């Protein structure tokens, strides 16, 4: 698989910073999360994972073509009255292969996140919101997975994006994994929804990278804003 050729081997296990987990008595602190902290659900409902790349990773870095930012939508801070996207926070921005693996190996993967969590990875300075000017005229491809079974597909999606494996990578804004009670969803957001050739190419390549056999659909953000769940797929592959 092409995305498995990424340079993970340049980082050895002893270079990863150890995961920092807080005590379980901090359930009320989710709204005060610092940059780099992600709450988890279940027995360790008050736990957080904090990531800061060690100084050792600054040696001989392998730069990525683009810088990327992880964002987290904290389910504990959401309310029905809050505006959509108001609880999304930037977690960490990375620009090298080493920084990516340092962060990825020290944050909770989708199967460990609480219900309702949304975890994003977007190109730096693009916010994962419909209102962002770069996203405004775009749309998204979406894949679905059984609850707790999206970890590997999420990783391969990230590797394909940051490794610039897509022929129309300039069209990609980022990706998000949504953790819900019945299923997990992974979506790739793009810039120009009306560019059918580029969107179809991205959808087909994404399925190939993940060896995903089900049909996937592309929805325009504009339709999603107007129709919510009633929005129809404009493209399918």
UniProtKB/Swiss-Prot annotation:
Keywords: Cytoplasm, Disulfide bond, Host-virus interaction, Initiation factor, Nucleus, Plant defense, Protein biosynthesis, RNA-binding, Translation regulation
Composition bias type Acidic residues, residue spans: 25-44
Cell compartment(s), UniProt: Nucleus; Cytoplasm
Top-rank lineage group of the source organism: Eukaryota
Cystine crosslinks: 135-173
One example GO MF annotation: translation initiation factor activity
Effect of residue 180 to K: In strain: Liao 04M05-3 and Zhongzuo J8035
GO annotation, biological process: defense response to virus; regulation of translation; response to virus; translational initiation
Tissue-specificity statement: Mostly expressed in roots, flowers, immature pods and mature seeds, and, to a lower extent, in stems and leaves.
List of residues binding mRNA: 80-85, 112, 130-131, 180-185, 225-229
Location (main, coarse): nucleus
Alphabetized SUPFAM superfamilies for the sequence: eIF4e-like (SSF55418)
PROSITE patterns given in the database record: IF4E (PS00813)
Low complexity composition-biased segments: 47-58
Region of interest: Disordered: 1-61
Disrupted-gene phenotype: (Microbial infection) Increased resistance to potyvirus such as soybean mosaic virus (SMV), bean common mosaic virus (BCMV) and watermelon mosaic virus (WMV), but susceptible to bean pod mottle virus (BPMV).
Reported modifications of this chain: According to the redox status, the Cys-135-Cys-173 disulfide bridge may have a role in regulating protein function by affecting its ability to bind capped mRNA.
Entry's Gene Ontology cellular component terms: cytoplasm; eukaryotic translation initiation factor 4F complex; nucleus
Region (EIF4G-binding): 62-65, 72-108, 156-165
InterPro entries xrefs: TIF_eIF4e-like, TIF_eIF_4E, TIF_eIF_4E_CS
Family per similarity comment: Belongs to the eukaryotic initiation factor 4E family.
Function: Component of the protein complex eIF4F, which is involved in the recognition of the mRNA cap, ATP-dependent unwinding of 5'-terminal secondary structure and recruitment of mRNA to the ribosome. Recognizes and binds the 7-methylguanosine-containing mRNA cap during an early step in the initiation of protein synthesis and facilitates ribosome binding by inducing the unwinding of the mRNAs secondary structures. Key component of recessive resistance to potyviruses (e.g.
Subunit annotation: EIF4F is a multi-subunit complex, the composition of which varies with external and internal environmental conditions. It is composed of at least EIF4A, EIF4E and EIF4G. EIF4E is also known to interact with other partners. In higher plants two isoforms of EIF4F have been identified, named isoform EIF4F and isoform EIF(iso)4F. Isoform EIF4F has subunits p220 and p26, whereas isoform EIF(iso)4F has subunits p82 and p28.
Name this protein carries in UniProt: Eukaryotic translation initiation factor 4E-1
Organism: Glycine max (Soybean)
């Amino acid at each position: 698989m092409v995305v498995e050729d990424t340079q993970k081997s340049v980082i050895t296990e002893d270079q990863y910073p150890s995961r920092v987990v807080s005590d379980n008595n901090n359930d009320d602190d989710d709204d005060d999360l610092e940059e780099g902290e992600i709450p988890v659900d279940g027995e360790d409902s008050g736990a957080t994972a904090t990531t800061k790349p060690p100084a050792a990773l600054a040696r001989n870095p392998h730069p990525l073509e683009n810088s990327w930012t992880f964002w987290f939508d904290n389910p504990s801070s959401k309310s029905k009255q809050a505006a959509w996207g108001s609880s999304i926070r930037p977690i960490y921005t990375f620009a090298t292969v080493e920084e990516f693996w340092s962060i990825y190996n020290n944050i909770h993967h989708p199967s460990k996140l609480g219900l309702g969590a949304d975890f994003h990875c977007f190109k730096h300075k693009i916010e994962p919101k419909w209102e962002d000017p770069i996203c405004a005229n775009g749309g998204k491809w979406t894949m679905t997975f059984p609850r707790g079974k999206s970890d590997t597909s999420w990783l391969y999606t990230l590797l394909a994006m940051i490794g610039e494996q897509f022929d129309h990578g300039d069209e990609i804004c980022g990706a998000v994994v949504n953790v819900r009670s019945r299923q997990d969803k992974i979506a790739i957001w793009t810039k120009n929804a009306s560019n059918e050739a580029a969107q179809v190419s991205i959808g087909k390549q994404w399925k190939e990278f993940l060896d995903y056999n089900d049909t996937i659909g592309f929805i325009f953000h504009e339709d999603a804003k107007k129709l919510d769940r009633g929005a129809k797929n404009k493209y399918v592959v």
